[in-house]
């Protein structure tokens, strides 16, 4: 069960109930009304299904959020395998794996909870590397964005224009927008770390190339033919086939040249996906 924590927190603030969209993996999809037992005395009721997504309402008392975090595990991508029936307890391999995942599958600059997956291009950055970039005169601009379910969902339609991309919550504050506009005005490049950052920046940029402070949900689907307005270069990992992420970088660079680069990466045994290597595209 993977939950949209940011949406759940907003629903909790608005209604007093923690309810959100979830991805449920089960041998059989639970019917609406089914009560799920999640450990730590937490139960969740399935409200409805929307395509691959299930709407779930959680119940757990006053300290629900504390127990939810204690019961939950880091939502690793499905291709990263862990023992499905591990021995539980202090100091066990399962606990050590979980502690390592919570550290490794998180960027050093993360501040707000809410993403269902790490913005994996950011995993390459350390505090020392960020300090070294700043020392060289690189202005690091921070925005808030919560990676959503769309990062896991392949494109299954024949015409990619028919694909419905999931929205992701973001915040671009006044300071970030001002820094980016000032840099662009001075002829500096805007280098986005990760495809979600690309989508957010492009979503907030007008036809004249000026970015505005905003917050909300970004549902911009970028595929070949899109004209970029803000981003000049991208740092990104190697992505799954048939993914919106691969389509985005194909739109930025050129599909055939991207596929040629992927072939070189395979031949040279580069690491792919979340814990893999990154590429710089300009």
How should these model regions be labeled?
Residues 1-282:
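Surface-exposed, charge/polar-rich loops and edge strands
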């Amino acid at each position: 069960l993977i939950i949209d924590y940011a949406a759940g927190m907003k629903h909790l603030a608005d209604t007093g109930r923690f309810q959100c969209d979830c991805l449920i993996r089960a041998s059989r999809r639970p019917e609406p009304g089914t009560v799920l037992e999640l450990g730590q005395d937490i139960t969740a009721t399935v409200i409805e299904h929307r395509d691959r997504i299930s709407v779930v309402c959680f119940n757990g008392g006053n300290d629900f959020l504390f127990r939810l975090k204690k019961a939950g595990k880091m939502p690793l991508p499905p291709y990263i395998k862990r023992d499905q029936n591990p021995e539980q307890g202090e100091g066990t391999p399962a606990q050590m794996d979980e502690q390592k995942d919570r550290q490794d599958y998180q960027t050093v600059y993360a501040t707000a909870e809410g993403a269902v997956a790490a913005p994996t291009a950011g995993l390459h950055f350390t505090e020392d590397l960020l300090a070294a970039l700043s020392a060289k005169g690189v202005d690091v601009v921070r925005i808030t964005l919560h990676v959503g379910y769309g990062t896991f969902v392949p494109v299954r339609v024949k015409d990619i224009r028919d694909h419905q991309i999931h929205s992701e919550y973001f915040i671009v504050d006044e300071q970030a927008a001002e820094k980016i506009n000032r840099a662009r005005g001075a002829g500096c490049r805007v280098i986005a770390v990760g495809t979600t950052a690309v989508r957010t920046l492009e979503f907030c940029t007008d036809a004249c190339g000026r970015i505005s402070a905003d917050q909300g949900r970004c549902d911009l689907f970028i595929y070949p033919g899109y004209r970029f307005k803000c981003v000049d270069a991208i740092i990104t990992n190697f992505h799954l086939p048939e993914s919106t992420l691969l389509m985005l970088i194909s739109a930025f660079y050129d599909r055939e040249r991207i596929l040629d680069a992927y072939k070189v990466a395979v031949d040279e045994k580069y690491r792919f996906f979340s814990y893999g290597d990154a590429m710089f595209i300009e």
